A protein has these predicted regions:
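Flavin-dependent oxidoreductase catalytic cores
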Residues: 1-192
Length: 192
């Protein structure tokens, strides 16, 4: 804010709870465990502190490196797995709170439980999905199947990982359902 001015919006990706049982031990939905990282009581105080420090929005999820699947829920995680925690945190701040991670946000936004929803993987699957929603073409949307095979480089063929090099930072993301994602220079039709 000192550099860009007070009217420049600053948001923070904020994990409400760590969902971590211990070093390299993430918790699963519905599991009874003792939180080793940030718990809800700490998060309630931290969210208010972040607002007072000047953040204009909290873009929330759950998880840590040891429980990464909360921030990027795969198909086996329940839909709206972060919603209750994020909606709870909204009560402690006066700035917009966005919820990320595999969700259907319409009812939660309409009810005022959250202010918005964060999406990333769906844009890899279909970069035009918002336009298609706005134009009543929902049936034309190529959906993210939550597989992590392309976007997280987790697919292997005969023991060989996909062709994404760690140094490929300009075309880092891939998508299992959209071969063109971040590969426009590689996969294209060249007029002859």
């Amino acid at each position: 804010k000192k550099v860009c001015g007070q009217d420049f919006p600053v948001s923070l990706r904020y994990s409400v709870e760590s969902k971590t049982k211990g070093f390299r031990e993430g918790a699963l939905p519905g599991e009874s465990f003792t939180e080793a990282g940030r718990d809800m009581a700490e998060s309630e105080k931290a969210a208010k502190y972040l607002q007072d420090a000047g953040y204009d929005m909290l873009n929330c999820d759950n998880g840590t490196y040891d429980a990464w699947y909360w921030a990027h829920p795969p198909i086996y995680m329940p839909e709206n797995c972060n919603l209750e925690d994020v909606a709870h945190i909204r009560k402690f701040v006066d700035i917009p709170v966005v919820c990320a991670g595999r969700m259907d946000p319409a009812a939660a936004i309409a009810d005022g439980r959250i202010d918005g929803a964060g999406f990333a993987r769906q844009f890899l699957a279909d970069q035009e999905w918002v336009t298609k929603l706005m134009n009543d073409k929902e049936d034309d949307i190529r959906p993210c199947i939550l597989c992590h095979n392309g976007c997280f480089n987790m697919c292997h063929y005969k023991g060989v990982p996909n062709d994404q090099a760690l140094s490929d930072s300009l075309h880092l993301a891939r998508c299992a359902v959209n071969a063109e994602t971040m590969q426009w220079e590689k996969h294209k039709i060249v007029p002859t």
